[in-house]
Amino acid sequence: MNETMKAEIESQDDELFDLTPSYLKKEIMVLACGNILFADDGFSVHVIEKLNKILTDKEKQKIALVDAGAGAPQQVLTLIDENSKTKKIIVVDVIDWGIKPGEIKIIEKDELPNPKYHRLDSHDWPLAPLLREVAEKYNIEVKVVGCQAKYISEPDVYIGLSEEVEKAVDKAVEIILRELRGD
């Protein structure tokens, strides 16, 4: 067996045993954090579903749309390492900043809140420190598209968005599309 054949076989073996999630093999990740079972907490799921319908197949080759649910954003972010292709992460979530329900707030990496004073999401999980760490450690651009929730039913199940948050879905999609397409 010549060297060229050996190299080709080794390359195929590397691909067979590559356990890197597909979303870490793309340049841009849109990370939805939320749960449709808890009213406005489902905001990000509606946004990601609309983006999935609007983005072209060509765009999806470099953009990963990740519905991480309410509990998995931390797990997704902890899988990022120096081998990840990710250069930009856009997090979509409801926020609790005491602004008008349905209002969209764009949060840049440097504006990520100190969880002692503001919660990035409406849960008690401090996502902001992990986002900041990933951004700085791996030189990844991070933005959060947050929507002020009106009502989160957790722990009770309520499927559906409040009128204010439902109206904000299209606005968030427009903002994200401009960010993705450079418009």
Swiss-Prot record:
InterPro entries: Pept_A31_F420-red_hyd_d, Pept_HybD-like_dom_sf, Peptidase_A31. The keyword Protease applies. One of its GO terms (biological process) is protein processing. Keywords: Aspartyl protease, Hydrolase, Protease. Transmembrane segments: none annotated. One of its GO terms (molecular function) is aspartic-type endopeptidase activity. It comes from the Archaea. Pfam families: HycI. PANTHER family: HYDROGENASE 1 MATURATION PROTEASE, HYDROGENASE 2 MATURATION PROTEASE. Belongs to the peptidase A31 family. This is Coenzyme F420 hydrogenase subunit delta. The gene is frhD.
